[in-house]
């Protein structure tokens, strides 16, 4: 079973629907015991780094995520991926889960629209097996 962490800051239903489509057993949960019993963990997220960390703290999920991430596959999606770093600087400096060394810094705009949302052509910098079936000039969102 895959635990999809429900801490009030994620697009959890699209993740659940994707796993259902793939025929994978999953559960939306904010329960530490369910996360501990899971075979894998997905931490989705939408919103701001500081408020998301506060919601994880309020649900007493920080230590369970830190512990369980060392034992089983763990995937952070969007904000959830940012939260796995040591610190984030969105709005204010805020400690993250510390699963990966490093910080999440604001990208300087330099005349660009940030955040950018829309379709773009992939430009490969390195060979990546995950992208082989997409083609050399695939458009992605």
Predicted features along the sequence, with ranges:
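Structural motif
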Residues: 42-44
